[in-house]
């Protein structure tokens, strides 16, 4: 019989890498295998330091601007991050005669196309998102200056004054809070009944799925841990969702070492999820850290099963990706269904 105090960990599923993040990391790894180091990457490929450092160790070099690539290495490939880039970046790459591989998430690319479609139909584009986020910069950069208005809050929506309220279309950043976005859209649609929606939902399936799993696990949690980086939009939204839906406390952690166990107080139930840029190996690391201090029982809070996969760039499809190539980010509890795992009953809405 264990002398350690009992602890239930509610493990959210889905969690961690989405198909777009998986694809972006694979593109860098496959480019390194095919073309050799260095492979340059414009901006962090995904917003996670562990992933970035792991790729750096394999020969990736991260830059913020194409000008930072030494002239002697301009024959090497440069990868554009999963967040997408303004058109000016690919135009500059062509001007420099760079060989670039676009790792923009296909769902972000779809938002770009939706914004362009709105403009072609004579609509001014409203983008709901967070100022300064690379995805927002990339989406706004698909159209000329002045063609897109960024709306961040309900207050922005209340005071927005368009030139022509009858010729508006909206798109959204893919990693937003579903509830916050709904609140903004409610205001916009009441003020501007002619506001055109995109052809398909802009907030991506993975963002929605991770938020739904967090909602299911939050109520009754003494602590909700979200694995992710401070610059990860979707991870920060998960922290907010956890607290909004009943967790006593929710914190963002990058590694197990970030957890100050001495200050956690008495715990009986904690919940654990990970942002779409956070590797499963860190989830394993955190569970292991708790097992050293508690007699852990795992419950799986599963709200969806994800099977989505995206093809890598055509130039890389002749390279074989092995499990060892992805071992630095892969974990051992991807589904969470271990021998001591129980399913958490998810109430039907």
UniProtKB/Swiss-Prot annotation:
Which GO biological process entries does UniProt record here?
dimethylallyl diphosphate biosynthetic process; isopentenyl diphosphate biosynthetic process, methylerythritol 4-phosphate pathway; terpenoid biosynthetic process
Catalysed reaction(s) here are:
isopentenyl diphosphate + 2 oxidized [2Fe-2S]-[ferredoxin] + H2O = (2E)-4-hydroxy-3-methylbut-2-enyl diphosphate + 2 reduced [2Fe-2S]-[ferredoxin] + 2 H(+); dimethylallyl diphosphate + 2 oxidized [2Fe-2S]-[ferredoxin] + H2O = (2E)-4-hydroxy-3-methylbut-2-enyl diphosphate + 2 reduced [2Fe-2S]-[ferredoxin] + 2 H(+)
InterPro entries linked: LytB/IspH (IPR003451)
Per UniProt, what is one GO molecular function of this protein? metal ion binding
Q: Which residues bind isopentenyl diphosphate?
A: 47, 83, 133, 232-234, 277
Which controlled-vocabulary keywords does the entry list? 4Fe-4S, Iron, Iron-sulfur, Isoprene biosynthesis, Metal-binding, Oxidoreductase
**Which amino acid positions bind (2E)-4-hydroxy-3-methylbut-2-enyl diphosphate, per UniProt?**
47, 83, 133, 174, 232-234, 277
Stated EC number for the protein is 1.17.7.4
Pathway info: Isoprenoid biosynthesis; dimethylallyl diphosphate biosynthesis; dimethylallyl diphosphate from (2E)-4-hydroxy-3-methylbutenyl diphosphate: step 1/1; Isoprenoid biosynthesis; isopentenyl diphosphate biosynthesis via DXP pathway; isopentenyl diphosphate from 1-deoxy-D-xylulose 5-phosphate: step 6/6
Q: Where does [4Fe-4S] cluster bind?
A: 18, 105, 204
Question: So where's the catalytic machinery, residue-wise?
Answer: 135 (proton donor)
This protein's cofactor list reads: [4Fe-4S] cluster
Positions contributing to dimethylallyl diphosphate binding:
47, 83, 133, 232-234, 277
Q: How is the cofactor bound?
A: Binds 1 [4Fe-4S] cluster per subunit.
What the protein does comes down to: Catalyzes the conversion of 1-hydroxy-2-methyl-2-(E)-butenyl 4-diphosphate (HMBPP) into a mixture of isopentenyl diphosphate (IPP) and dimethylallyl diphosphate (DMAPP). Acts in the terminal step of the DOXP/MEP pathway for isoprenoid precursor biosynthesis.
Of which family is this protein a member?
Belongs to the IspH family.
Q: What is this protein called?
A: 4-hydroxy-3-methylbut-2-enyl diphosphate reductase
């Amino acid at each position: 019989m264990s002398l350690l105090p009992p602890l239930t960990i509610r493990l959210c599923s889905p969690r961690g890498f989405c198909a777009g993040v998986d694809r972006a990391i694979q593109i860098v790894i496959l480019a390194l295998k095919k073309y050799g180091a260095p492979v340059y990457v414009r901006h962090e490929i995904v917003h996670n330091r562990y992933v970035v450092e792991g790729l750096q160790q394999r020969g990736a070099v991260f830059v913020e601007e194409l000008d930072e690539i030494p002239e002697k290495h301009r024959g090497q490939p440069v990868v554009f991050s999963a967040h997408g880039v303004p058109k000016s970046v690919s135009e500059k790459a062509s001007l420099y005669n760079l060989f670039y591989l676009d790792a923009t998430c296909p769902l972000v690319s779809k938002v770009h196309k939706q914004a362009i479609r709105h403009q072609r139909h004579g609509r001014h584009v409203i983008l709901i998102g967070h100022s300064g986020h690379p995805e927002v910069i990339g989406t706004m950069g698909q159209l000329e200056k002045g063609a897109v208005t960024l709306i961040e809050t309900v207050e922005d929506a209340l005071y927005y004054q368009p030139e022509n309220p009858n010729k508006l279309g909206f798109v959204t950043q893919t990693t937003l809070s579903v509830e916050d976005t709904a609140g903004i859209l409610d205001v916009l649609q009441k003020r501007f009944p002619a506001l055109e929606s995109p052809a398909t939902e802009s907030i991506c399936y993975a963002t929605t799925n991770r938020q739904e799993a967090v909602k299911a696990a939050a109520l009754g949690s003494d602590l909700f841990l979200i694995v992710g980086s401070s610059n990860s939009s979707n991870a920060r939204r998960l922290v907010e969702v956890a607290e909004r839906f009943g967790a006593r406390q929710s914190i963002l952690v990058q590694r197990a070492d970030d957890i100050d166990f001495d200050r956690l107080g008495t715990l009986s139930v904690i919940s654990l999820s990970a942002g779409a840029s956070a590797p499963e190996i860190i989830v394993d690391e955190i569970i292991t850290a708790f097992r050293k201090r508690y007699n852990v029982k795992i419950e799986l809070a599963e709200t969806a099963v994800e099977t989505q996969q995206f093809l890598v760039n055509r130039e890389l499809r002749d390279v074989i990706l092995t499990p060892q190539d992805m071992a630095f980010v892969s974990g051992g509890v991807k589904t969470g269904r271990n021998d001591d795992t129980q399913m958490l009953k998810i109430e039907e809405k």
